[in-house]
Amino acid sequence: MASEIFGTAAVFWVLIPVGLLGGAILLKLQGD
């Protein structure tokens, strides 16, 4: 059970920053 929770947390820790960076880059490209 602990490994599943840790794995899910790790996925979120990776996806959230990637999503934020991706969104910022898209907004920057659209701005131009």
Curated annotation (Swiss-Prot):
Record's bilayer topology term: Single-pass membrane protein
Database matches in InterPro entries: PetM_cyt_b6/f_cplx_su7
Cellular component, GO, one term: plasma membrane-derived thylakoid membrane
Keyword Oxidoreductase on entry: no
A GO biological process held by the record: photosynthesis
Function statement: Component of the cytochrome b6-f complex, which mediates electron transfer between photosystem II (PSII) and photosystem I (PSI), cyclic electron flow around PSI, and state transitions.
Protein's name in the database: Cytochrome b6-f complex subunit 7
